[in-house]
């Protein structure tokens, strides 16, 4: 709900001298133990019920179905844009306070796992997409215990679809990879994407490793790819990146190319919520799943969140 603690306190303080002090709070459901409940909403409800909260307290719970300004047809349209197995559907549509737990991309994992029996996977494409307007590469640098990851993503015209074109992950668990060797891995990946799909419009890298980024720029220049635009990733809030990906999957606007994205498929099928985080939503990052590849993929789409939503 993006209600920062300092913002809440400041908003309250600004009304201390008001003649008719009123605070209106409108929000979507969150984690049941989020501070917005434990420190404010539920706390005030308890105090009011006990007669200890002066000034009054009103609480109403509404869902999408209670909105009289939205037609039934539009409500069904909105509901169809969510994966019914996701926490976003439970919260935004059903209005429930739920903990983020289990698989993050359950619908995707189900489609991949059932493919051996049904020979169908609705997220997989086998033919080269004809209408790509942008091809973006994301790079995440790993250290000991993780790995370096490259992901190439194609975006179709008018931001209608996300199509992951290729992914590659290099293990660093036994020691980091030499920067020159990493640079060559990067160049090989770029040429593979160029030869198969066409021009690369941008490369976004993990901004925490400026030395490695400069190394990629230098290697690219030496090997005929000096025109590549290699910049820092935006590093949007992780839950917002996850939310977009789940939303695109639910609307069948997310795909990946067959035989080219093994590391990404594995990463998505094993991504889970952190079971130890009872207050906030957090993706588990303890080495049991490939977070490097997930980050690299998300770097390719995070700058366009509003555009993907705008063209729904």
List the predicted regions and their residue ranges.
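Acidic two-metal-ion nuclease catalytic site recognized across multiple nuclease folds
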Residues: 116-120, 301-312
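Short His-Asn-centered micro-motif
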Residues: 1, 26-28, 139-141, 153, ...
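ATPase catalytic-site recognition across NTP-hydrolyzing enzymes
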Residues: 68-142
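Mg2+-dependent endonuclease catalytic cores in nucleic-acid-processing enzymes, primarily RNase H-like
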Residues: 161-284, 307-308
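Short loop/turn segments immediately following beta-strands, especially the blade-tip
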Residues: 46, 154-158
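ASCE P-loop NTPase helicase motor core
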Residues: 3-82
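Short beta-strand scaffold segments in enzyme catalytic cores
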Residues: 147-154
């Amino acid at each position: 709900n993006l209600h920062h603690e300092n913002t809440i306190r400041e908003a309250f303080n600004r009304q201390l001298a008001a003649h008719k002090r009123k605070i209106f709070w409108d929000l979507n459901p969150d984690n049941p133990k989020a501070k917005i409940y434990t420190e404010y909403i539920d706390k005030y409800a308890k105090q009011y019920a006990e007669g200890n909260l002066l000034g009054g307290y009103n609480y109403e719970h509404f869902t999408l179905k209670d909105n009289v300004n939205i037609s039934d047809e539009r409500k069904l349209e909105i509901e169809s844009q969510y994966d019914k197995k996701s926490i976003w559907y439970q919260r935004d549509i059903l209005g429930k306070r739920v903990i983020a737990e289990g698989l993050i991309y359950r619908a995707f994992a189900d489609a991949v796992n059932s493919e051996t029996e049904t020979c169908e996977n609705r997220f997989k494409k086998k033919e080269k997409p004809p209408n790509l307007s942008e091809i973006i590469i994301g790079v995440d640098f790993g250290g000991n215990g993780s790995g370096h990851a490259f992901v190439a993503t194609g975006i179709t015209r008018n931001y209608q679809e996300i199509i992951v074109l290729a992914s590659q992950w290099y293990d660093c668990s036994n020691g980091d990879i030499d920067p020159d060797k990493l640079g060559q891995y990067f160049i090989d990946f770029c040429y593979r994407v160029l030869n198969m799909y066409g021009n690369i419009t941008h490369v976004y890298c993990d901004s925490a490793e400026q030395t490695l980024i400069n190394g990629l720029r230098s290697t690219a220049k030496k090997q005929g790819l000096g025109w590549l635009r290699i910049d820092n990733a935006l590093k949007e809030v992780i839950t917002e990146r996850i939310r977009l990906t789940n939303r695109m999957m639910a609307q069948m606007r997310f795909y990946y190319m067959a035989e080219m994205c093994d590391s990404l498929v594995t990463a998505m099928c094993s991504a889970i919520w952190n079971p130890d985080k009872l207050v906030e939503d957090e993706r588990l990052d303890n080495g049991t799943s490939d977070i490097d590849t997930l980050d690299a993929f998300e770097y390719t789409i995070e700058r366009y969140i509003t555009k993907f939503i705008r063209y729904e």
